[in-house]
């Protein structure tokens, strides 16, 4: 959602006066900030609690490299001394340097990690975030973004009736209405596509894939986990080039790639991440992850005392029903070409085969996909 051009808060009610907003300033406060999400979502059978240690690490300067290029302030809302909500306000300095037409740009701040018990709490929290952003010179809000645009952007508006797959958000269905009541309007629609991967591509697409397999100038290969850092660098370079003109794009830093790579390395399977080469040069990639949420959902956010054994066993031999494609891209100079579509179909098909034969998966999700990315939406609809 995009907020008013000038972040502002209007229409406070008497009940708002019962709510106090306090900034988080230390480790204890960050732990309380994390706990709020578990308590407020405990009633939702489709909410997947993240591992607490990862949720805390996300909020900790010195551990999450997002803080190297961002100013972040966390807030907790209390009523009668009891925590009833939370929000983060943040300014990504890399985002400030992007063109305004791409959604970010000078003067744009963000808030996210939002949870609230009721609408009055929501008003008070968003007012606090807007006041903090205004005090830092921001004139516009794009939210919710938690924390980076590469993590959990946006507010879920459809799909509350089933749990999210790995690295996808899940928020209370009431929130969107509360945001709109405060003057926020939709800035961009993001889609995720759910696919029955047991179904083969139509014959035309199968012929396109077969043609690519016979083309000596094309090579689609698995990543080599023994060269993890080098492969990650190839993907980073391709991603930053492929997505440079996309709405919401903010460059990913090498430190963020290393941080994310370290977290994902136990989950990475070489045969689920493809790099496409044309005439010997990497020009496209597709990253697919087994749905870790199937394993961690019953753990309710805790690894100890015995859940770490269950998680380790699952990671050694995952058999997820679902896979998710969080990232894919084709270098800019090939976009909108027949070759780009061919490479995309080839990567999807090769990973589809592996997901079925080696992991027993039956379902896939591709997303996020921007509403105006007609090429990718056409591929997902095929």
Model-identified regions with their sequence ranges:
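Short, Lys/Arg-enriched N-terminal segments with co-localized hydrophobic residues
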Residues: 1-13
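TRNA-binding/sensing appendages of the translation machinery
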Residues: 15-57, 130
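Acyltransferase donor/substrate-recognition loop-hinge adjacent to the catalytic core
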Residues: 15-19, 169-248, 272
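Catalytic cores of nucleotide-enabled group-transfer and carboxylate-activating enzymes in metabolic
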Residues: 27-30, 49-61, 66-86, 92-94, ...
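A conserved beta-strand-loop-helix scaffold within acyl/acetyltransferase catalytic domains
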Residues: 37-79, 87-101, 227-330
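An acidic- and aromatic-residue-enriched active-site/binding cleft used to recognize and process polar
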Residues: 80, 90-94, 114-116, 146-148, ...
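Acyl-donor binding region in acyl/amide transferases
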Residues: 97-183, 299-382
């Amino acid at each position: 959602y995009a907020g008013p051009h000038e972040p502002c808060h209007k229409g406070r009610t008497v009940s708002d006066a019962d709510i106090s907003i306090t900034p988080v300033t230390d480790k204890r406060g960050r732990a309380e900030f994390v706990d709020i999400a578990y308590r407020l979502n405990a009633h939702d059978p489709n909410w997947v609690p993240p591992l607490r240690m990862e949720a805390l690490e996300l909020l900790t300067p010195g551990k999450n490299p997002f803080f190297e290029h961002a100013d972040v302030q966390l807030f907790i809302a209390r009523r009668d001394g009891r925590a009833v909500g939370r929000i983060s306000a943040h300014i990504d300095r890399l985002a400030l340097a992007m063109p305004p037409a791409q959604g970010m740009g000078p003067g744009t701040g963000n808030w996210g990690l939002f949870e609230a018990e009721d609408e009055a709490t929501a008003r008070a929290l968003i007012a606090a975030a807007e006041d903090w952003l205004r005090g830092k010179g921001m004139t516009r809000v794009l939210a919710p973004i938690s924390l980076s645009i590469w993590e959990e952007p946006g507010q879920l508006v459809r799909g509350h009736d089933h749990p999210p797959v790995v690295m996808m958000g899940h928020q209370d269905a009431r929130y969107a209405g509360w945001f709109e009541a405060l003057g926020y309007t939709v800035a961009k629609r993001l889609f995720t596509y759910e696919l029955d991967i047991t179904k083969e591509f139509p014959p035309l697409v199968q012929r396109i894939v077969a043609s690519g397999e016979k083309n000596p100038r094309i090579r689609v290969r698995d990543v080599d986990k023994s060269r993890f850092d080098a492969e990650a660098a190839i993907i980073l370079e391709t991603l930053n080039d492929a997505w440079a003109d996309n709405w919401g794009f903010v460059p990913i830093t090498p430190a963020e790639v290393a941080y994310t790579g370290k977290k994902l390395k136990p989950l990475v399977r070489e045969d689920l991440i493809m790099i496409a080469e044309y005439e010997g040069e990497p020009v496209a990639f597709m990253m697919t992850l087994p749905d870790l949420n199937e394993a961690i959902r019953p753990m309710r956010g805790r690894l100890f005392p015995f859940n770490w054994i269950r998680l380790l066993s699952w990671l050694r031999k995952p058999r997820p029903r679902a896979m998710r494609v969080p990232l894919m891209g084709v270098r800019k100079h090939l976009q909108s070409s027949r070759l780009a579509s061919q490479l995309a179909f080839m990567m999807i098909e090769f990973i589809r085969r592996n997901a079925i034969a080696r992991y027993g998966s039956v379902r896939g999700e591709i997303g996020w996909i921007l509403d105006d990315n007609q090429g990718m939406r056409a591929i997902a609809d095929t």
